Structure formats: C-alpha cells, structure tokens
Design a protein with these regions (language model features):
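C-terminal domain-closing interface element
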Residues: 180-188
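Generic detector of bulky aromatic hydrophobic side chains
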Residues: 5-10, 126, 140-141, 157, ...
Length: 188
C-alpha cells in the first residue's frame, strides 16, 4: 500500500511539473471518477461525433457505452484484455501496447483500419488505455493523421476534447515519423 501511495505521489508531482496545476487537476478528476464509478467521463473524451478517447471502464461503463450507441472498442492495454473480463463491445480490437512506449507499426495499421471502418459505417468507436492519456490518444492522433491532418492539427483536436493527454517521447517520435510517411505517400 505504501508503495502504491509513493508511486501515486511521484506521478502527481511529475504531472504538476510538466503540465501545471489546472491540467493535473483535470487529469486527476478524469482518473478518479472512472475509478470510483466504473464509467468513463465522455464529455472529456469526445474528439469527434464518432471517435472517443478515454480510460479503462468496468461493467457499468460497458453498459453506459452500449446505451450511448457504441459498437466498436479499441483496447491499447497489454496488461488487461477486455474480452477476458466480458467488457468487449460488438466489435473489439485489442492492440496490446506497453504503457509509455510507441505502438508497433502493425498495431498502428490495424488500429487505424479498425477506427476507419467504424467511422465509415457511421458508428462510434471508443479507444482506451488505462488512463486515456498516452496510448489511446496516440492511436487517435495517428488515425487523424491518416485522414490527412497534420500532427499539430490532430493534437489540437484531441487536446480540445482531452486537455490532459501526455504523449511520451517515443510515442511522439512515432507520430512524427508517421506524419512524414503519410505526407510523402500523399504527394507521391
């Protein structure tokens, strides 16, 4: 228990230094409500009418997502498979990625294709990792880049919905390389 508290204080201090008080409080609220209620805070997670990003949810969160018309779910967590716990939706894509690391190119491609398919059908997709601040936003950013946005524009879009995201350096490197590759492919 002491180790858990020390780790929490360390994470909180790091966020305060890097993101400031306001963003850290929003992040803490965004983590606390889902933890205690099992329901993600969708008002912070709606990036577009069909693409949502957020934290892990529990059974009540799954019911809420279904009641809001969600059929597609992307889980970025290597440490937790929604299907093993009965939390998957009608259409489920598990892209196990270690926290704070870049998504593999294979998973990036599969994730983008999965999101694109849902959006093309006019259906909502919920992308999550543990906290909804690193892995899930990274995939969402890559999806928007694949649709022709610049990384800067995609970051603005996602941060407008979820201002406390924190893309780790390896994730940002991946996104920059993906943007360069996507831009080169579009002009070729």
């Amino acid at each position: 228990m002491i180790r858990f508290i020390k780790n929490g204080v360390r994470i909180l201090a790091r966020r305060l230094r890097r993101q400031g008080l306001r963003t850290t409080l929003i992040w803490a609220y965004g983590r606390g409500v889902p933890y205690f209620t099992g329901t993600p805070i969708l008002k912070y997670s709606r990036v577009t009418p069909l693409v949502y990003v957020g934290p892990q949810f529990r059974k009540s969160g799954r019911s809420m997502l279904q009641s809001k018309g969600f059929k597609h779910l992307v889980n970025m967590r290597i440490e937790f498979d929604d299907a093993e716990h009965g939390l998957e939706l009608e259409s489920y894509c598990h892209l196990p990625t270690v926290d704070d690391t870049a998504i593999s190119m294979e998973h990036l491609s599969r994730g983008i294709e999965f999101i694109h398919s849902a959006v093309e059908q006019g259906e909502k997709v919920y992308i999550h990792c543990s906290a909804g601040v690193g892995r899930a936003p990274t995939l969402a950013l890559a999806y928007f880049i694949s649709r022709g946005m610049t990384l800067a524009d995609a970051l603005t879009l996602v941060k407008r919905a979820r201002p406390f995201i924190y893309i780790m350096p390896p994730q940002m490197e991946l996104l920059r390389a993906f943007e360069t590759e996507s831009t080169a492919g579009a002009t070729a």
